[in-house]
Amino acid sequence: MATYISLIRFTQKGVETIREGPKRLDLARQAFRDAGAELKAFYLVTGQYDAVAISEAPNDETVAKLALRTAAMGNVRTETLRAFSEDEYRRIIASIG
């Protein structure tokens, strides 16, 4: 499965209902499992983002659907990046000669 990094910002609604955050995170984990993906790690962070999530999914389409479903709830906005492992990085570089 491919690895993805999601950079998360709380919306005003998300901040106002922050005490429900752990429950929403549990629901997100289940949604990932139901989609054949896995939410591997979640971090509350400081700086320009509020949280970071690391996930694995079978393809970009699955991650896009999960991101859109999450955004539709109105509590967070995400920016998701496809992350390449060191092995993938080395293979990509080797393939360009």
Task: Name each region found by the language model.
Residues 1-97:
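A compositional/biophysical signature of low hydrophobicity enriched in polar/charged and small residues
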